[in-house]
Amino acid sequence: MNSTSLYAAIDLGSNSFHMLVVREAAGSIQTLTRIKRKVRLAAGLNNDNHLSAEAMERGWQCLRLFAERLQDIPQPQIRVVATATLRLAVNAGEFIAKAQTILGCPVQVISGEEEARLIYQGAAHTTGGADQRLVVDIGGASTELVTGTGAQTTSLFSLSMGCVTWLERYFSDRNLAQENFDDAEKAARDVLRPVADELRFHGWKVCVGASGTVQALQEIMMAQGMDERITLAKLQQLKQRAIQCGRLEELEIEGLTLERALVFPSGLAILIAIFTELNIQSMTLAGGALREGLVYGMLHLAVDQDIRSRTLRNIQRRFIVDTDQANRVAKLADNFLKQVENAWHIEPISRELLLSACQLHEIGLSVDFKQAPYHAAYLVRHLDLPGYTPAQKKLLATLLLNQTNPVDLSSLHQQNAVPPRVAEQLCRLLRLAILFAGRRRDDLVPEITLQALNENLTLTLPGDWLAHHPLGKELIDQESQWQSYVHWPLDVR
């Protein structure tokens, strides 16, 4: 592999050190390596902000691992940044000098504002949804809050609180008592209060979280079969569960990994304070943050107006998809959706996911015609899809799995991006659009009227269409039968 196409970003965080190695290919980024080590640098800071020898040694040990991988990458294509703990440490110079010797490249201690800007860039490049966003990143010793529109930030704040420092300060007795949570939340709200008005003034349509705490919450919710939106009610529920566990070493929540458990209660307390102080309705996981911001910055790639569209284009190119056919199916599905939207009340995000499924429905053909829906579902489940959340990826894979042949109803019910009933409705529209666009020519798509009454669909074709299209009639009869097996009434006239 040509080493000039490789880029590396290293983030010396207060809780973990991370390394991301990517390859730039045709304007998109392919992740090659992700290495993360819990160094807990912030835990080595004493009251005088002196970093202990043990903490520094943990950091250097980790960097020796990273250094081996960096040898293959040109130095101008490597960026190493250090954040809150090394901003604070009075003896940071000693740590950084040795770190630079180990890595063989410069280490830059970045300001809180620069960290916030990079986090925003990373999220903007990799997260779909509305353009106007609030990005929250709870680190080990600092928390970044950024508002922005598209690629432009409108306000940037880096606050002195993090999951490691709050752990040492409010849960040092390892006791998960209500009082400890109350103290941690109150302190976090005190830190937030001076910046809350400005953040609210700039406003946001979507809120995304880009930290280990939010990642942990996502894993918990997926494991417990909840939808992926983080809400204050869910956070309070998890806090009560933590309090019931009593002690940090006894903390057990389904979906919470052992490595995330230590700083989970302190991160949770900070997040509850952020939700309360800023009156956040819901939050989802960002596709990327600081490291992605560094990589995209080195590549000078512009933030797309629509990240999901860029992702779909890249995948279609990679798997040699017939884009005319994909657009034909999407146009028909959208037409069907407009005809039933009053009866079925399908939300804009559900529409967008249906149209995404249309754009990708033939990627399985790049593997083999036989079992193409299975191949398509597998590919979507395992591909990196910037702009789509894990739950949305699962829904797309499920729709592609059920694009033809008998319907696997249980798979539509196991995804958690949309309610099961909505997943069923999207699946029905996708199947009909694929069926009627099957001859791959615009002039051969009949005029179709679709009406919905509850779950009953009535499909009306031009008068003599069925008589003149015996194969088409056979396919429609078969589809009608398959839909009836799962109690989806389809009346064709």
UniProtKB/Swiss-Prot annotation:
Catalytic activity: guanosine 3'-diphosphate 5'-triphosphate + H2O = guanosine 3',5'-bis(diphosphate) + phosphate + H(+)
Statement: the UniProt record of this protein carries the keyword Hydrolase: yes
Assigned EC number: 3.6.1.40
Alphabetized GO MF terms: guanosine-5'-triphosphate,3'-diphosphate diphosphatase activity
GO biological-process terms attached to the record: guanosine pentaphosphate catabolic process; guanosine tetraphosphate biosynthetic process; nucleobase-containing small molecule interconversion
Span of the signal peptide: none
Keyword terms: Hydrolase
Pfam family, one: Ppx-GppA
Domain of life (superkingdom): Bacteria
Pathways per UniProt: Purine metabolism; ppGpp biosynthesis; ppGpp from GTP: step 2/2
InterPro entries assigned: ATPase_NBD (IPR043129), GppA/Ppx_hydrolase (IPR050273), Guo-5TP_3DP_PyrP (IPR023709), Ppx_GppA_C (IPR048950), Ppx_GppA_N (IPR003695), PyroPPase_GppA_Ppx (IPR030673)
CDD domains registered for this protein in UniProt: ASKHA_NBD_EcGppA-like (cd24117)
Family: Belongs to the GppA/Ppx family. GppA subfamily.
Function text: Catalyzes the conversion of pppGpp to ppGpp. Guanosine pentaphosphate (pppGpp) is a cytoplasmic signaling molecule which together with ppGpp controls the 'stringent response', an adaptive process that allows bacteria to respond to amino acid starvation, resulting in the coordinated regulation of numerous cellular activities.
Protein name per the record: Guanosine-5'-triphosphate,3'-diphosphate pyrophosphatase
Organism: Salmonella paratyphi A (strain AKU_12601)
